[in-house]
Each structure stands twice: as C-alpha cells, then as structure tokens.
Amino acid sequence: MNGSFFFSHFKEFTIRNTNYFLYEESKKSYKSCIVWYMNHYQRFGGSIRRYSNALGQLIDRKKRNLVNIEKGNEILKSYKRVNLKKILKDGDKKKEIYENDKIVSDNIISDNNISNNNISDNNISHNNIGDNNISNNIISDNILSDNILSNNILCDNIVNDKIKYDKGEKWINENVLKKVEGKDNENLDDFNDKDKRNNNKNIMNIENKNIYNINTNSSTFCTHNHINDEHVKDSVDELFCTKEKKKQLMKRIIFQNNHDYMHLIERYEEYKIKQEDEFYNSSNDKNEEEYSSYPSFIKKKEENKSNDDNNNNVNEKMCEKENFKCKEKSSNNDVHYYLYEVDKDNEESNVNMHFNFLKNNLNISIFPEIGKKDILESCKRKKNMQNEINKNSDIKNMFNNDIYFWTKRKVHRAIGWDLIPDNLKRNDDIIDVSELRYGHLKGSTKEEEKEDNNREVGYKDDNNKIHKTMKQHINKDIEQNTGQDKNSNIKGKSVEEENMYMGEKKNDINVQLDDINVQLDDINVQLDDINIQLDEINLNKDERDKKKISYIQRRVAPCNFLKKLDIYKSDATLLNDGSSTIQMNKNVDVICEEDNKEMEKEEEKKYEETNKEPTNQMKEEKLIDIFLNNDNNLGNVKNVEYIKAEVNKGDHKLDKLDIKKEDDEYNEIVEIDSCQNDNIKNKEKNMKYMNGSYNNMNEEDKHYESDDKTYYEGIVDNSKNVFKKMKENYDMFKKNNMSPYILEDCEKYINYYYGIEKEERIKELRKYADMDFYEIMGNGNFGIEDYNMLIKSKILFNKEEEGFHYFNLLKKYDIRINIETYNSLMYTCIVQKNSKLSRLIYLQIIKDLFIPNKNTFCILIKAHILDKDIKSAFHLYRKMIKENIEVDIVIYSTLIDGLIKNKLYKRAEQFFNYIVNYKNVVPDEILYTIMIKNCAYNREAEKCLNYYETMLSQNLRITDITLIEIINCLSRREDYFYKVFYFYHIYLSNEMKINQRLMLYMIMACSNKGNIKRLKEILKTMNKNKIKISDEMYCYIVRTFANNCKDKRVSLSERHNNIKYAWRIIYDLLKGSSHMKKKEKEKEKDIYIDKYIDKEKEKYIDKYIDKEKDIYIDNYIDKQIDERHGEMISTKEHIKKNPTDDNKNIESYNKNDHISFDRVNHLYKGTELHSSTSHDCINTKILNSLILLYINCEYYEYAINMLKYFSYFECVPDYYTFNMLFNMLYYKMKDYGKVLCLYDYMINNTQNKPNEKILNLILNSAIQTKSSKNTLFILRQMFTYKIYPSPKMVKKLYHVGRYITEIQLLINSMIRQQTKDIYEVNLKENQLIRLNIDEYELNLFKEGKTFKSKTPLDEAREQFFKRKQRMEKEKRMSKNKKSSDWLPYGQYLQSKKKGGEIYAKRVDRPRPLAFDD
C-alpha cells in the first residue's frame, strides 16, 4: 500500500472508525494516533488479501459451506448456507447511504461530544464506506463481524461507543499512548482503567461467544429507531412473502451494515410481537424474560434517554452489563444461521460437518401453534410461515419445538420419520428444524470447541453421563491436533507445507472420528433404550397419580361385574386383570372314546355330510317333490306326522300381517311385514319374563295377582272407552229416531273409528285351520273358494306340506280348480321366502293353461322381495306392463314396501311421488301406512304427522297397524316423546290389543328420553298382559339407564345405581338363557337318540330279512336298547358325581351290539352349533348400550375397555359402536391420536365401512394431530369411497396444507371428481323426468288427447273461475242496475261534487210537501 493511496483514504480514520486507532477525549477535542495502525499494517494487509471477497456474507468454502445429514457413510440430505454476497451484491447504494447517514447522526446526537465539522467529515467517510471496492475502508465493522469464521482475526466489539481491546493489542496501545500523549497522564490513567475493565469483559465475551452470533455493535443496538421506519417494515414484510424473488426484494432493505440484515429482521419481529411473547412462552420458566435481550434492553435504554448528559457513562455501563448477561445466557441457544436444501454433491466419507441423529420417537407438527390459536386466524395474520420459523429459531421455544414441514417439506421426506398414530401425543418430543445443530466442526475455532464441550444436553437419566464424558474426550483429541497445526503455522512454514501437513492430519483425524462415531452410535442406542424405559416408568407413575379414583368409581368398572358372572359349566369363564378369556370345560355327555376310531370317523363323516344341507333346502325339495310328483299314497294324508307345532286356537299370533282389501272389483291379500330392525332376535327360546330386575316391581306384581280388581292398568286416561260409548249411543239414537243433526255429528266420529282388520282376518283363516280335506269334501255346501281358503290357512299356520297334499288331492279327484287355487298355494313362497319355488309354480300355471292375473304377479313380486331380489321384482313389474296386465295400487304398495325392506328409502319416496304424479294413483290406508314406516327409518316425524293428517282429511280408516307405525316413527325422536303417549292413549281407547311390537316401540321412546318412571309403568303393563320381554327390549331398557345419566341433575349415586341395574339385567339374561338351553339340549338329544335308534333298526332289518325272525329281532333289539340306555344313564350320573374318577375311561361299546350310545352323544355334540352358548342372549346392541351408559356417566376409559369384552360375548362391534367411541374421543376427550388408532382398527379388523360423517370427523382429527401423512391417508380414503369434504373443509385444508403439493393436487382431483359425479346424477335425474313426461304424453295420445286437451276436472275448474269472475264484476256495478243504465263518466263526476244545483236538489234545498200544493 503506497503512501498516496494511504493518504487518499486517510479520511477513513475519523471518529466513526475508532475500531482500529486509539483516541483520547480531552476538552471536547480528539487527538488521533495512527502509529498503531502503521505498526500493524502487515497483519491487516494479510487479512485484506485473504478476506477481501467476504464482505457481508458467510465465508465461501466448498466443503465447509455444506451441512450433511448422514448415517454412517450414507448421506441422507445436504444443506447449504445462504450466500449473502450474491443476494446483496447489487444493493441500492443511495438508500443505504441515506440510512447510514441517519444512523450516524443519531449516534452523534446521543454522545453530545462531536462538533459540526466532525459530523460532516463522518458523513463523507461514511459515503465511501458504502463502496464495495477493495480498499482501506474494508477495515470496518464488516471485516471483523461474527460471520467471518477464523481463528487468526479477533473481532472488536463496540457496545455504546466504548472501546474493547483484544489481549494482543493492549500492551502496544498502552505504549503508544505513553509516547504520544504524555501530556494528559491523568486522563490516560482513567482511560486505562476503563480499558482494563473493558478488556476483561471482552475476553469473557470472546470465550463464551457462539460462532453464529451476529455482531452486536452500536448500530445494531440502535435499530429501534429504524424499526419505526415504515420503509423497513414494508421491506421486511415483502421479504417473507415470496421465496423465488428474494434476491430482488433484498434490494429494498436498508441497513448500515449489509451482513446485519438478518439480525435487524429478527429484532424487528421480536419488537413487533412482544405482546404475544407472554402467551407463547407460557410453558417456559417464569424468569425467562431475563433471557430476552432486545426488548428489555430497549426499554431500559429508552428510559435512560430522558436522563441528563452527565449520566451517559452510567447508562452505557448498564447497557454493557445488560448485553453481557444476555450473551452469557443465550450463547448456546441464539442461533441465527439459515440453511436451504441442496443436492448431494459431496458423497465422500470425510465430511466436515455432521448432524447428531435424532430420537426414534420423533414427531412432526404441521401448524404454527399447537392448539393455542385458531389456524385460520393465524393464516390471516401471517401471510407466510417464514415469520413463524424466525420466531421459532429464537432463544424462546415459542411453539413447543414444532417442525413446520409445510415450508420445509423435503426434510421429513428425506430423513424418513415414521408417523404412527400411537406417537401422536402431546407429551412426545417434537423437534424444530431451525434448531438442528452440528455435531463437531473440523474447521471450528477454540471457542466453539470449548463451547461444545461445555454444552449440556438435558438427559433425564444419570447413565447419560457416559455420553458426555466420551464427547469431552473426543473434543480434547481434536483440540490437540488442531493446536499442533496452529503451532506449525506460527513457526514459519510455507503455505504448501502447511497444506500438505494439514491434509495428512485431516485424514488421520477423519479415520479416528469414524471409529469414535461408530462407538458413539452404539452407546446412543443403548442410552435411548434406557431412556425410553425410564420415561415409561415415569409416565406410568404420573398417570397413576393423575388417575387416582375413588373406591366407588372403581367398583363401577366392567371387569368387577364380569367377575361376578355365574355361567353354566360348559361355558365357565375366568377373567384376569380385566381381560376376558374363555375356557371351556369338558362336556359330561362325552363319557369315553371308542376303541375302534376308524369306524367312528367314517360314521361321523357320513352324518356330517347329511347335516351340511340346510333345513330350508330340505323343505324346498320336499315341497317340490310333492308338487311335481302326484303320489299314489295320497289317502294316507291323515297319518302324516308334522314336526311343527299345532295351531293354538285362542292365543296364537302371526308374525306376518294380512290386510284384506274390501273393494268389490278384486279380493286379495296384501302382506305387509312388521317393521323390525335387523338386529332383533325374535326367538321363542330367548323370550322370557322380566324377573328380578326390580324388587319393588315383583312385590307389586304379586299384589296384582292376588286381586284381579286392583290391577294397575298402565298409562291409561279416563277417556279410554269414549269411542265405544259413542257407538252405543249412536245405535240407541238410531232406534229411537232422534234428531238427524245428532246422527250426522255421530257419524263423523264413527267413520273416524279405527278398524282392527288383522284380528278379523286371522279369525276367518282360523276356521279352516283345524278342518280336514275330507270333511269339506263330505259337506256339499263348500265350493272351490273354501278349498282355496283351506290351502291358504294350512300354509299360513306352518303346515305347508299338508297344503301341497291337499292341492294334489284336488287334482286327483278332478275338482275344478282356478287361478286362485294356485295363488293360495303360492303363499308358501312368501312364508318360506323362496323365489325359486314361486317361479316353478308360475311355470306350472302356464303349463296347465291358466292365465296369471294381477294377484299372481303380486305374490311373485312379494316372494322375490322377501328373498332380497328387488331387481327381479321390478322386472316382473315391467313384464306386467308389457303383457297389458293391470297394475293397481296393491302392486305399487308391494314394490314400495320392498324398497323399504331393502333399505332403499330415498328410492321408495321417489317411486311414491312418481306413481302419484304421473300414474294418477290415489293412495289408500295401506300405502300411507307404508310411507309412515319409511318415515320411521328416516326419523322424519314431521312428514309422518303430515301423512296422518292427510289420511284424516280424506276420511281414510286408521287401523291399529297405522297407529303402531306412527308410534314407531315418533319413538325415535326425543322431542316427540309426549306425542307418542298421545297416540298410545288413542290405541288403548279403541280397545285394541296390546302386542309385543307396540311395547317395544314404547320402551324405545322411554329409552331415547331417558325416562325411567314411564319405563316402569310400561313394564308393569306388559306383566299385566303377560307379554314376554325380548332381547331387543332388554337392550332399550339398558339404554334408558344410559340416557338418564345425560341429565346434569342426576347425582353420582344415581348414576352408579343405573350401572348396577344394567349389569343386573345382563345377569338375568345369562342365567335364563343357560337354564333354558339345558332343557333344549336334553330335548334335542332325546330326539336325536330316537332317530339314531330307528336307523340302526332299519340296518338290522335289512341284514336279517327272513320273515320268521322279524319278531325275534325286534324284541331282541328293544331289550338291548333298554339295557344300553339304562347303563348310559347310570354311568352319566356316576361321572357327574365323581368327575375326576377313572370311570371316564370306561368303554360302553359292545362288540356284539353295534349300537353305541356314546357314539350317539358324540355325534350329537358334533351337530351342535357354535353359537349355542349361554352368551347368545347378549348381542352387540346390548353391549353398545353399556358403552353409551359409561360415556354418559363420564367413565371414558371404561367405555373404551368395553371393546375387550366383545370377543368374550362372541360379538363384533358394529357401526354404532365406533360412532359412539369416535364422538367420545374427539369431542369429549379430545384425544385425536386415539381417534386415528381406532379408525385403523375399524378398517383392518372389522367389516364396517366408514360413512361421510365418520370420515369428516377422522379428517378433522388428522388435521388436529398436525400430521401430513395422516391427512393424506384420510383424504385418499375419502377419494376411494367417493365421499368429498365440504367447502368449509376444503378451505381449511387449503390454508393448512398450502405448502404440501400432494394435498393440493388431491383436493383438486376430488373437486373435479365431485363435479363429474354431481353432473352425472343431475343428468340422470333430468333424463328420468323427461322420460316420465314422455310416458305420460304417450298415455294421453292413446286416449286421443294432448297436453292442451282438457280433462273433466280442468273443465269444472274453468267454469268455477269464470263464474267467480262474473260475480266479482256484478259486485262492482250498482245494485239492481245493468251496465247500460250507468251514467256517462262526466255526469257521474258532477253528481259526486259538492255544491251546484244537482247537489242542492239532493241535499240542500228542502222540497215542498204534497199537501202544500
């Protein structure tokens, strides 16, 4: 550097650049000294040559500029530092100069010690500093900033215009001061004292300093003045709005020093959201505010500004202390570097920088705030998530260390973190990408290595001390090696020798580091396992402490009730720690095994093959054989034995419902099935009385049995016999010829009377049930219609074979039959739900040259509907149209009823509207009743009541079936609870019989409301009428207790009593079912033994055919059977008394006698169904009611534990089970991880498919867990099921996943698919409407009409409106005058005016009287 060049830039050594020359303050004048600078020129020249290209950026190193995440020798991902030089190379100089001038002027005013001339000089010098040329102005703050990672250059830090020296500079500076400034010794001494203090602080700062800590000089700490500048705010906001145009946007940012831009932005963001710091740092320590350097510093500095100039030194000291404390406490956490992802351009094993591997239980969060603020609000407040990342990288971990992978989405994909629903909990470790630190840096300084050694990692376990000591030893070895390298450089070796020597050392160190890293990995794995175990122990202890419940609450647990179950020996159970295990004991019926096992296996196979055929198929074959083959033994019909029970004359009730159509045009029967749920088990063996449920009720029932007159009649009002009395009065009025007005009023209400057609129809059929074919044949008064009724009654009362034999007898005796005979025979297909047999009978009708009528097709359609073949039913409907067979309201009613039974409720309503609008069908009582049943399934109580009012307005008779269906519909709605009892009173007032279906719906109404008082009254009414309680009723009784616990007014003791009552019902069910099954097994076993004996007899008879020995053989067999039967009974009793005796091994097989009763027992056991256990009475619906009971009692863990016991009762959870648990976990527990786990269990382990409601709830929970993997999984599930999110959910997904391209693409594809589906549906609906209109038009053309042709109804309507218009016109005219008598309009106006002659004639002038003339 020559002299001219030096003195041309001598202006740089003004008061602003006091970093590199010494000055003394005396009487407001400054004496500069440049001797120190000249002496140390060579050292600065080397630094200028070496670092001249490093202004305002991190050092550009090929290998050191890369950060690799690797496992062993495999590089998982590489990151590169931000190149600030490229970003700020073309900065706006004018704005930078203007801003620097402003900053310098502010600093000068704060000191109050600089003259105006010096200010101008400083401005000139500062303008030159803005240039990027390689000159002496390089010796500025930028050269010695913290971004220069070097050990040879020590930076000088200035805090509030106070000088701090390095260790090597102090001695030289003191000597220079003594030589040059000898006059002011007193000031020098004071100044040296300050230097000593400042040097001590500076040394401590350098030792404790972090490598990535940004320079904190006076200009950066005075940025609060520039924070208020709106230009800077705009530039900061625009900086983080985009990613791709960052280089151009950086031109707008104005800074004093280019490399401090990140520091300024962070300070500005901290200043901007200081009010939110308390909210985000609520989980940290209370004293954490002390760690925040900037806000507290600014506050104190602003307070100190108001003081006098004499207190400036005190303020400066306070600021220094404040800054020193902040540095000391935040040295390990204040990380301000930024990384971006690059390709793997360095695949060598000798890499310079490594990341420590992360924990296995790592979790990823996708939102800026974990449940603390709404997502949409944060998205509106922040335009980009980059601001959140900046905050998150500060000292304070404001967002619980979340990974914002929405912006850094490639990180989690590269590392491959597994997202499992089990790990989605709040207590799991969550890491922040911005806080990832390097393991060990080869090119790091001594200060960094010491800091790494002193850095403490917060382990919970003491065993992790091994890891710390190993780390310290490794770093010491590295220090020794690097120290040798530095000493070699000091000795004066050349650069090439130094490079060769350093390369060899690096290779040696890398080899050592690889070995040490392998050892550290093994140690880390062991320590992680120990930590996981200890964490589990600590968590279990914490959970136990938190979940301490009272003794009363523990007694309510389901495991305590299940331990008390007393079950039949064959199904004995043992419960261990709440988990149910079934251990089946040995059956007493199996006494011993046979010696000859081969013979036994052969016989077992034969009987198994015969038993594989279902009973329904056997019946079909029998009936088909009887129908197609005319047996010769038809005379022996009387001797045919039927297994089915005989008809009870008085108390028998049909499951099916027959309604007679009373029109004269046709006589037929329309069969409507009772509206029952699919899960109801209406078996006679499971029907039982309610015993032991309520002790008080049992006592009252005994009281009722003693006195018939004091029966409790249930919920009945005093007006129950109103209609009966009214009918009696009407008959009396008719006899006595009372007033016709009274009779008319009575007839209105009598027509309103509800008919009981079901019982009347059953009474008619019961007359023929006990009659015989020959009795009717002997009586000459019976015709073919009576034969038809006989066949129909036999079929409807479960005697199908007898009905078919009677049909063959009709053919045998040439009795003339008609199509109705075949129709009566075809009712067998409806009873047995056999569509195949119905088609065979239809073919036989055509073969016998009979023409099928509409009743035939109605029965065919009904048979196919009951066989769950709705498509074939509609094919038959179209066949009727093609063959021009009349389709009346009965066919339409049957088709709509079939759609409802196949759960096509929407299609049923559409078909009803079609026949009413386009076919001009007028609904009757039956069709309205069917539509009310459809409303019951859809829970549309309002529409049901509308149908009821329509029936009343059309004077249709409302039968008992209609009332029962109305009660069924209203019982499913809680808000119509009292309306249910209104119709129940109407039912009772008409003296209709109380049946089981009605009581079921009344119990359902009580269960939905949770009204136990009304439930007791219903149960008493059932006991009075001797109606048995079914399993479905027990389910709703338990549900009544569950819904009763919803009320907040219910106390804890009442809730516990409800749980006890519910389990008491289950005890009664299990005991009753086990007792009844014992009897059933004994009966079935006796029947099976008798059959087996008969077969054995036939075998012996075939072997010994001789007629002479027949009697002897029969006697011999009977004797042997009696003997063996007695032996079997004795051995059974003996074994039951002594089950552990050796008599179990006794053989009961006799070689001379081939009949083995043990074999009979063994074969009988093989034919038993697996479901015939004592748990048959407990179904899924009862267990669902128990889960609901625990949920409403707020015992959520017990509700989840109930899933374990489904397998114990041999049940499978259904849709309602999972729906209740999903709602509980999401809305009440808010445990979104368990929601995802339960959904995974439902999909993989059950056959339940999610619907729209469940999938939307699962999607919300996946978003709440802040996992993109789970969110994408649920969205794909919705896409496959063609269930689409709502517009609100789409908007939420857009904001949440705006940086995940897969989510955006999937949402777009779902929107496109949804539009396609909706378009196709609308197109089909429009085509169907167009088709219906065309069909209606064609039907009009057949009649010779068009749309414009008027029907009689249209003509009558037109006449009515014409007459109405004429009447309105006549009202406008004057009374008794025609339109021709009207006055002209002008005369009319004059007559209305007041005044004038016309008015005087009318009003004013009195006229003379007649007698005056």
From Swiss-Prot:
Q: Does the keyword Cell inner membrane apply?
A: no
Compositional bias (Basic and acidic residues): 299-308
Q: Name one Pfam family in it.
A: PPR_2
* Keywords recorded for this protein, A-Z: Merozoite, Repeat
Q: Which InterPro entries match?
A: Pentatricopeptide_rpt (IPR002885), TPR-like_helical_dom_sf (IPR011990)
Q: Where are the PPR repeats?
A: 783-817, 818-852, 853-887, 888-923, 924-958, 995-1029, 1179-1213, 1214-1245, 1251-1285
Any GO CC annotation of this UniProt entry: cytoplasm
Family (UniProt): Belongs to the PPR family.
Q: Can you say what this protein is called? A: Pentatricopeptide repeat-containing protein 2
Taxonomic source organism: Plasmodium falciparum (isolate 3D7)
